Amino acid sequence: MAKKVEAYIKLQIPAGKANPSPPVGPALGQRGVNIMEFCKAFNAATQQMEQGLPIPVVITVYSDRSFTFITKTPPASVLLKKAAGIQSGSGTPNTKKVAKLNVSQLEEIAKVKKPDLTAADLAAAVRSIAGTARSMGIEVEGLE
């Protein structure tokens, strides 16, 4: 018989830098999960990723206090800011543009994000990423 799911916990943790301090400790502690065991497993799973990049993770906690987790790809906004070399997006994206990216850069980001996107193909994924870029005040060159 399958284990009974007690909770799903969604967090964004920097790759390779999970530790028992907030937000990880309190979120897992109130569910009775072994915090250090999760931190070691998460850090091992994100070891090959760029250190410090925020990684969304969904932790499934079972009634016997065991857990499993699924790591997702970094948020598109973080990847766009990194590609554009900016600290934050524009406060007024319609009037003030903060950076320019071309289609090839968006394709690279779309390839990274593809597993988590519902887009049918790469072109649709690029359009989705371009929409995120425009909402951040990043100008997209070469997209019709």
Swiss-Prot record:
<keyword id="KW-0687">Ribonucleoprotein</keyword>
<comment type="function">
    <text>Forms part of the ribosomal stalk which helps the ribosome interact with GTP-bound translation factors.</text>
</comment>
<keyword id="KW-0694">RNA-binding</keyword>
<keyword id="KW-0488">Methylation</keyword>
<dbReference type="InterPro" id="IPR006519">
    <property type="entry name" value="Ribosomal_uL11_bac-typ"/>
</dbReference>
<dbReference type="InterPro" id="IPR036769">
    <property type="entry name" value="Ribosomal_uL11_C_sf"/>
</dbReference>
<dbReference type="InterPro" id="IPR020784">
    <property type="entry name" value="Ribosomal_uL11_N"/>
</dbReference>
<dbReference type="GO" id="GO:0003735">
    <property type="term" value="F:structural constituent of ribosome"/>
</dbReference>
<dbReference type="InterPro" id="IPR000911">
    <property type="entry name" value="Ribosomal_uL11"/>
</dbReference>
<dbReference type="Pfam" id="PF03946">
    <property type="entry name" value="Ribosomal_L11_N"/>
</dbReference>
<keyword id="KW-0689">Ribosomal protein</keyword>
<keyword id="KW-0699">rRNA-binding</keyword>
<comment type="subunit">
    <text>Part of the ribosomal stalk of the 50S ribosomal subunit. Interacts with L10 and the large rRNA to form the base of the stalk. L10 forms an elongated spine to which L12 dimers bind in a sequential fashion forming a multimeric L10(L12)X complex.</text>
</comment>
<dbReference type="InterPro" id="IPR020785">
    <property type="entry name" value="Ribosomal_uL11_CS"/>
</dbReference>
<protein>
    <recommendedName>
        <fullName>Large ribosomal subunit protein uL11</fullName>
    </recommendedName>
</protein>
<dbReference type="InterPro" id="IPR020783">
    <property type="entry name" value="Ribosomal_uL11_C"/>
</dbReference>
<dbReference type="GO" id="GO:0006412">
    <property type="term" value="P:translation"/>
</dbReference>
<dbReference type="GO" id="GO:0022625">
    <property type="term" value="C:cytosolic large ribosomal subunit"/>
</dbReference>
<dbReference type="InterPro" id="IPR036796">
    <property type="entry name" value="Ribosomal_uL11_N_sf"/>
</dbReference>
<dbReference type="Pfam" id="PF00298">
    <property type="entry name" value="Ribosomal_L11"/>
</dbReference>
<comment type="similarity">
    <text>Belongs to the universal ribosomal protein uL11 family.</text>
</comment>
<dbReference type="GO" id="GO:0070180">
    <property type="term" value="F:large ribosomal subunit rRNA binding"/>
</dbReference>
